[in-house]
């Protein structure tokens, strides 16, 4: 078990009733953002993981997909627009001091103002979708986050 898994309670997480019944990723509190930022800092001390990421526009929607291998910890940017989040796999979502295990195929309403961490227990695909008027995928990144310069699609 990794250090971050022990420290942040990833193992043994359960999909809480709130996430399961409401199907929402709520806005993250300041304390929750600080926790995910700490996970980001920890992640930066580790060898970089390969997280294939693709994005495109279709039918007025921006679609962004990350493929996370089992064992990989991925932290999200602070998302400033409401989105749909589609998860397929087995992953623990860490937000606001709570861990939620999501297995199989799940569609969630992602609220604006959220920043979460994902720890893949099995290979997992996460897709984010939101409506936009932009015509180029790269123009959507600053629209959905102020942290766009740190996104996987911006890394060289």
What residue ranges belong to the model's regions?
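A short, N-terminal "cap"/entry segment at the start of jelly-roll beta-barrel domains
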Residues: 1-65, 96, 154-156
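Short, surface-exposed charged micro-motifs
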Residues: 54, 65, 75, 83, ...
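Conserved short histidine dyad/triad with adjacent acidic residue
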Residues: 59-79
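Conserved hydrophobic/aromatic beta-strand scaffold that supports enzyme active sites
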Residues: 63-67, 84, 99, 107-109
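Tight coil/turn sites that cap or link beta-strands
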Residues: 69-71, 105, 111-113, 121-123
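Glycine- and acidic-residue-biased ligand/ion/polar-headgroup-sensing regions
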Residues: 79-96
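Short acidic-glycine-tyrosine-enriched beta hairpin
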Residues: 92-115
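Double-stranded beta-helix
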Residues: 121-156
